[in-house]
Design a protein with these regions (language model features):
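Conserved donor-binding/catalytic core segment of Leloir-type glycosyltransferases
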Residues: 140-160, 166-171
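Conserved active-site histidine-acidic residue motif and adjacent donor-binding/catalytic loop
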Residues: 183-186, 192-208
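N-terminal subdomain of nucleotide-sugar transferases
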Residues: 1-3, 40-43, 67-68, 95, ...
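Short N-terminal targeting/anchoring amphipathic segment
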Residues: 35-56, 70
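N-terminal strand-loop element at the rim of the active site
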Residues: 1-30, 184
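Nucleotide-sugar donor phosphate/pyrophosphate-binding loop at the beta->alpha transition
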Residues: 56, 68, 75-103
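Acidic donor-binding loop of glycosyltransferase active sites
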Residues: 44, 208-214
Length: 214
């Protein structure tokens, strides 16, 4: 894949199951070396770190950076023994952060309860104009056309709820069309179209014609 000039490759990572998902982490001397080089060459006025609690590039950047820091928190969970044990080590570094952002109420509550701080709630931004334009371009539906339900997400993560959706569809007796977008294992389900990974343009086109987005 051709990457933009502003993207710096971090190197190999290994997967770790966490909170119903899979986190990919990089550890080792190369992480510290790359982070220091990135910060030095960038000469940033402000460094914005995502998930500073993650023991990889983010936490390393938090440890070595000297200038103003902003952090965005995405994760949430019910409990974490690892985070509890790491708290004495983490808190001094987290105190370097001048501005915190949480993308959801749960992420904010998790950060406040587990590690302190007072992040501002700012949900992830979505450029809706792309989808609004796709909606306008979508052909008008006739009164007898089936309702279209669209799912977008990773298929193999239980927390995304795909299997719950597929189970619920068995109880629907109306004429519907179901399109599933996302990477992972497709299921053999009658009346359900698994299209796999799609481009941004394809995603906008499919969402543009949807009646229900899950």
């Amino acid at each position: 894949t051709q990457l933009p000039d502003f993207v710096v490759k971090g190197g190999p990572a290994f997967p770790i199951a966490y909170n119903g998902s899979v986190a990919r982490l990089s550890v080792g001397p190369h992480v510290t070396r790359k982070v220091k080089q990135f910060i030095k060459e960038g000469d940033f006025d402000v460094l914005h770190i995502h998930e500073p609690n993650s023991p990889s590039f983010s936490m390393t950047a938090l440890a070595v950076a000297q200038g103003p820091l902003v952090a965005t928190y995405h994760a949430s969970a019910s409990s974490s023994l690892v985070l509890t044990l790491a708290k004495p080590f983490l808190v001094p570094f987290l105190e370097k952060i001048r501005g915190g952002i949480a993308v959801s109420d749960m992420a904010r509550r998790w950060q406040v309860e587990q590690l302190g701080g007072d992040p501002v709630l700012i949900p992830n931004g979505v450029d809706t104009s792309v989808y609004a334009q796709a909606r306008r371009r979508s052909p008008a539906k006739a009164s007898g056309d089936p309702l279209e339900v669209v799912f977008l997400g990773r298929l193999d993560e239980p927390r995304k709820g795909l299997d719950i959706l597929l189970s619920a569809l068995r109880q629907v007796h109306h004429d519907i069309r179901v399109t599933i977008m996302g990477g992972g294992r497709a299921r053999e389900v009658e009346g359900v179209d698994f299209v796999g990974r799609v481009s941004d343009a394809e995603k906008a086109e499919i969402l543009g014609r949807a009646d229900v987005y899950v």
